Amino acid sequence: MDKIWRELGLTDEEYEKIISILGREPNITEIGMYSVMWSEHCAYKNSKPLLKYLPTKGERVIQGPGENAGVLDIGDNLAVVMKIESHNHPSAIEPYQGAATGVGGIIRDIFTMGARPIALLDSLRFGIPDDKRTKYLIENVVAGIADYGNCIGIPTVGGDTYFEESYKGNPLVNAMCVGIVEKDKIKKGIAKGIGNPVMIVGATTGRDGIGGASFASQELSEESEEKRPSVQVGDPFMEKLLLEACLELFETDAVVAIQDMGAAGLTSSSCEMASRGGVGMELDLDKVPLREKGMTPYEIMLSESQERMLVVVEKGKEEDVQKVFKKWGLNAATIGKITDDGMIRVIKEGKIVAEVPAKSLAEDAPQYIREEEVPKWQEDVNKLNINEVKPPEDMNKALKDVISSLNIASKEWIYSQYDYMVRTDTAITPGMDAAVVRIKGTKKAIALTTDCNGRYCYLDPYIGSQIAVAEAARNLCMVGAKPIGVTDCLNFGNPEKKEIYWQLKNSIFGIAKACETLQIPVVSGNVSLYNENEEGAIYPTPVIGMAGLIEDVSKICTMDFKKERDVIIILGENKGEIGGSEYLKVCFGMVKGQPPQIDLEEEKRLQELVLKLIDKGLINSSHDISEGGFAAALVESAISGKKGAKISLQTSLREDIELFSESPPRALITVSPEKVEEVLKIAYEYQVPAQKVGVVEGKKIAIEVNGKKIIDLPLEVLEESWRGRIKWEMERN
C-alpha cells in the first residue's frame, strides 16, 4: 500500500488528515472512499471558498445549491427544477459514452427531486474541426447526446456551441436538464428515521466508471487514454424505466429520501444523504445486485455504473417499493439501514470492511484558497491598436466571412440530430435566442438558454463572466421571458496554477456582480477544473444556464422578420468595441483587446423595455445583438424570416466597426409602421437609445453607411454561407 493514496489523487497532507479523523490508518476501501469524496469533482475543494460569493436567495427560490438540483417557484403550485453538469474529461477520452452518460446523469438529478424532466440543453466547446481527432470528438459527442436524449424521450431544445483552438483535445460537454414538479411533491436527499431500510434500485453494479470522480479531477495526458474504464456506459432505455418507476414510487408514501448514484456511486449517495440528515448508514455489500463476479468492496463502493438510485424507505414499505420496480422490470434490493451513530459502516461476508464518519466524507474535505496572479501574457493580449486593423476593401466578403464563421454559422448540423419536438411542448425550437417549452395544463411556458463567450473571459474573466450572465438574461427577454434563475457550470484549467486561480476567482466575482444587479439567483451548478492538457488550459468558460418564466405562451416573440415594410429599430448604443470580436478573429486572425464593457444598469433597462414591448404586443420580432454585431444579427433575423432588409446608418464610427462591434446591451427589433412612435416613446421612458435604421423588404441585404452603399448581397448567398459551413467542415477530408 506504499503511498497508494497519491495514485488515487490524495495529497500526503490529506492522507494525514484522514488518519487524524479515523484515529488509525485507513484500509484500501476507505482510502478509495475518501479519494473520490475529497476529489475536486465531488468536494469543490478549490472553488467552495469562492462559490459563497454567489447570490443564492430570491423570492422564487425553494431550493438553492446543496441538493441534487435547484428549485424555483413558478406559481400555480408548480416549480421548475434545474441543474447543469459537466462531463468533460470522460468525453475527451470516450466521446460517445462520455456525452451520453453526462445526459443520463443530469436527467437523474432532476427526477431525483420528484420532477418530470421536460427539456435538455447542451453547451459544447470543441477545437477547430480541421483534424481527424477533433471531428471524431464532435461527431461522437453529438451522437452520444442525441441517442441518449432521443431514446429516453426528453427533447434537446437548445444550447450553444463554440469552436476555439484552446478546446482542442479538451472538449467541454455541459448538459443541462429542466423538470417540472408540484411544489408539495418535491423530494430531497436527506436520510432520516433510525432503522429505516436503505434500498438500491435500478441497474446492477459493475466495474464501469470506478474512480471516475478522481479521474475528472486531473489534467488530461497521454496516459488518459488508458483510463477508458473510468468512463461509464449508459443505457437510456434502462433510464427511461428508472425514471417512470421513480415517479410512480413518489406517488406512494414509501420514500423518505432518494439520491441518484452519479460520481462516486454508492459512496457519495450514502454519505451525502446520511450527512445531510445527521445519521449513519450500514450497508451490506453481499446484498448489492452485481453484474460481474468477484467484485471487491473497493470496486462496489466506487463503481459509477449508471441508472442506479439509493432510496431510504419507510420501515415496512419495502414490498411496496419492490412491487413498483418489479412492474418496470428493475432491481430493488434492501442493502442496509439507517443508524444513529453518524458512521458509514460497510459489511462484506459478515466482516466490517470500511467504517468512516459520513460527515467527514461529505463535508470535511480540506478547502484551498490558492495563490493568484495576473497571467504574464494578460497585458499583452489586452493591447489593441485599432489603426493596425485596416478596414476591409470588400465589405460584402467581410460579412460573408463573419456569418459563416464556425461560431456564428448555423448549428443545424448539430441540433438536427436531436429530437427537439418529442413530448410536443416545444414552442420555440433550436436556433433562436432561447428555447421555449410549454407547461401542460397552464398558459405558462419556460424559456431556456445556455451562454458563455470563452474568448471574452480569456481577455477579462471579470467582464466576460458578467457578459455571459447578461447575454443569457437578454436572450430570455428576447422571447418574452422574465429571467428567474441560474445554474452555472464553471469550466477552468488547473487551479493550482496561480493565473488559472486568478481567472476562476475573477469569473465568479463577475457572475456574482451580474446576478446581484439583474436580481437572478444561482440555484445550482457544477465546477469542472483541470481542463488542460500538454498544449495548455482551455479558455475560462463559465457557462451560464438560465431559465425564464413566460406567464402567457401566446405572447412569445421570435427573432425572424415577419412582415414586409416593418421598421427595423436598434435598441441600445454601439460603443464601437471590437476587442475579442468574431470580426477581429475571422478577418484578421486576432484574439486581442478588451472585451466590450458592460453597464449592468443599462442592461437591466434594456431587458425591462423589451419585456414591456413584447407584453404590449408592440413588436413583431426581437433578436439580441452579440457575436458578429449588428450585421450578424440582421442576417440571422432575415434568414430565419426569409425576408431581406434595406438599412441606412448614420454614424461617427468606422463602417466596419459600426457593423461588427459587439457592444452590449443591444437588440434588433421590428415594428409595424403605425406602432413606431409608441415604441420610441416607451424606449425614451426607459432611457434606452432607440434608432430607426431601415425596413424589412425584398430578398437581399442592402446596407448604406453615411449615404455610401457598402453591402449588397442576395439573401440566398448569405444563407448558403451561414447554413452550410459546419456541415462542409465536418464532411471535407
Swiss-Prot record:
The active site is at residues 41, 87. Keywords: ATP-binding, Cytoplasm, Ligase, Magnesium, Metal-binding, Nucleotide-binding, Purine biosynthesis. One of its GO terms (biological process) is 'de novo' IMP biosynthetic process. The gene is purL. This is Phosphoribosylformylglycinamidine synthase subunit PurL. Part of the phosphoribosylformylglycinamidine synthase complex involved in the purines biosynthetic pathway. Catalyzes the ATP-dependent conversion of formylglycinamide ribonucleotide (FGAR) and glutamine to yield formylglycinamidine ribonucleotide (FGAM) and glutamate. The FGAM synthase complex is composed of three subunits. PurQ produces an ammonia molecule by converting glutamine to glutamate. PurL transfers the ammonia molecule to FGAR to form FGAM in an ATP-dependent manner. ATP binds at residues 44, 83, 488, 525. It comes from Thermoanaerobacter pseudethanolicus (strain ATCC 33223 / 39E). Monomer. Part of the FGAM synthase complex composed of 1 PurL, 1 PurQ and 2 PurS subunits. SUPFAM superfamilies: PurM C-terminal domain-like (SSF56042), PurM N-terminal domain-like (SSF55326).
